[in-house]
Swiss-Prot record:
Name of the featured protein: Ribonuclease H
EC numbers on record: 3.1.26.4
Sequence intervals crossing the membrane: none
GO BP of this protein: DNA replication, removal of RNA primer
Any Pfam family hit: RNase_H
InterPro entries recorded: RNase_H (IPR050092), RNaseH-like_sf (IPR012337), RNaseH_domain (IPR002156), RNaseH_sf (IPR036397), RNaseHI (IPR022892)
The keyword Nuclease is assigned to this record: yes
Cellular compartment(s): Cytoplasm
Organism of provenance: Chlorobium chlorochromatii (strain CaD3)
Family the entry assigns: Belongs to the RNase H family.
One GO cellular component term noted in the UniProt record for this chain: cytoplasm
Subunit structure: Monomer.
Length: 146
């Protein structure tokens, strides 16, 4: 039986593009692990994707994951089938433009083959303590890039 893990993620950018950070909480039973990282020159969407990728990559075995994010870009790409369509259309959007962040989407796809992940949208900068903590971790990570 696969372990059930809950992950909250958030990405942030000071300027877009600009220095960015990401934060994540991984929860298994009574254990919570906080992780974060940064990049000196990036975009908010890259940090949102990066948070999910880095958190999933930390799991040491295939897991059942509920992943919560305030990123419509991330959650809608999965839940609305955009990611599958982009792949079928040779990484082109419905408007026939190149999909951005292909490198990160491809990393995420590999992780989604290992873990069974359900994506959930949460309202950002609201009353969700876990999302707010991830935002705080992301913003603290940005400060470390300066």
């Amino acid at each position: 039986m696969k372990k059930q893990v809950t992950i909250y993620t958030d990405g942030a950018c000071s300027g877009n593009p600009g220095p960015g950070g990401w934060g994540a909480l991984l929860m298994f039973g009574s254990i919570t692990r906080e992780v974060s990282g940064s990049s000196p020159a990036t975009t908010n969407n890259r940090m949102e994707l990066g948070a999910a990728i880095e958190a999933l990559a930390l799991l040491k075995e295939p897991c059942l994951v509920d992943l919560y994010s305030d990123s419509s870009y991330l959650v809608n790409a999965i839940n609305n089938g955009w990611l599958q369509r982009w792949q079928r259309n040779s990484w082109q959007t419905a408007a026939k433009k190149s999909v951005e962040n292909i490198d990160l989407w491809q990393k995420l796809i590999k992780l989604l083959k290992v873990h069974e992940v359900r994506f959930h949208k949460v309202k950002g900068h609201s009353d969700n303590a876990y999302n707010n903590r991830c935002d705080q971790l992301a913003r603290e990570a940005i400060k470390k890039t300066s």
